[in-house]
A protein has these predicted regions:
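Active-site-adjacent pocket scaffolds in enzyme catalytic domains
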Residues: 1-43
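C-terminal domain-boundary segment and adjacent tail
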Residues: 26-126
């Protein structure tokens, strides 16, 4: 009792592949579009996965500039849109989960292509 499982927000990236919402897995454009889509479709929650180490490069000896930039852009976006998005952690949260996992959100393939280019550059210059 007192343990709850919160489903990850997932999306179709336009290539019929399902992805989860995470700073290392989504571009800022994808995340922003998905947040608006979730709000407009009446979703009660939007779960973003985050690990404490993901702002570092793979060798964990310096910041990952791409992921740090995504984090800053996400924080700025959420700050500018406080009237639309409520940000919170789990403490004191009363579960209000849907009976079934909602259908995946959808992101246009052009945003996926831009992310793939960004990821390729990120991997090349680790």
């Amino acid at each position: 009792d007192g343990i709850y499982e919160y489903p990850m927000t997932i999306y179709d990236d336009g290539t019929q592949s399902l992805r989860h919402t995470q700073l290392t897995a989504c571009s800022h454009r994808e995340m922003e579009g998905l947040l608006w889509q979730a709000l407009e479709s009446g979703r009660r929650s939007f779960m973003i996965l985050s690990h404490n180490f993901e702002l570092l490069n793979t060798t964990q000896d310096r910041p990952d500039d791409v992921v740090v930039s995504r984090f800053r852009q996400l924080c700025s976006f959420l700050d500018r849109n406080r009237d639309s998005f409520r940000v919170r952690g789990f403490e004191g949260l009363s579960p209000d989960l849907p009976a079934q996992q909602p259908a995946p959100l959808k992101s246009p393939v052009w945003k996926t292509a831009m992310r793939m280019l960004e990821q390729a550059g990120r991997r090349r210059f680790r």
